Structures are given as C-alpha cells and as structure tokens.
Amino acid sequence: MFKNITLSEIKQLENEVSYQPNQVSSKTIAQNKYVSITLFSFDKDEEISAHKSKGDAMVTILDGKSKITIDDKEYVLSKGETIVMPAGIPHALFAVEKFKMILTVVFPNE
C-alpha cells in the first residue's frame, strides 16, 4: 500500500520532498517485504556513504545532479537519468549539487 502520497491525483514527484539545509531528507511512499519506494532530497555536498542492499536499487534523478559510486566506479546523473545499483554490491551517493531522487528497491523472494 502507498502512504504519504495522495492517491488518484497527478503529482510532480520532485515537489513531494523538500530540500533541507545541510541534510538528506526522505519520504517513504511504499514499503513491504518485496519493494521499497522512497523519495529523497540531498542538499549540496551531502552524501550517503558506501553500503550494500539486499535488493536491486533503482535511482531516478528528479532534480539536480548526483555522483553515484557502484563498486568503485563513478557515475554522474542528472534530472531524468536512471541507474540500477545491483544487490550486494557497495554503492554510495554524493550531491554534486542539490538533488532529488526516487529510489525503488526490489527485494528477492525468500
């Protein structure tokens, strides 16, 4: 089930999460044992350090620019671009400039 978002209404997702000075902010809009969908905003120079996920994690940039590192390879993404970070592989995110993204993580059936 979705939460924190109005159903049956057209949305601009980048407007559903706000920038906060010197912070990473998030808003979970769906979560269960199979999938997690979260909106994020990063102020410039904020980051999430390297970590691994149990599921494949797809990032789509909604605004701004991010550097995403996957297994020591760097990618710079801008608005409208998407990348999938494979499960079990270290990845990190850094705000080259302030940016917003939607993160969809799909977990394996166990």
Where are these regions (language model features)?
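Conserved short histidine dyad/triad with adjacent acidic residue
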Residues: 22-23, 36-53
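Glycine- and acidic-residue-biased ligand/ion/polar-headgroup-sensing regions
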Residues: 55-67, 71
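Ligand-binding loop in jelly-roll beta-barrel domains
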Residues: 87-110
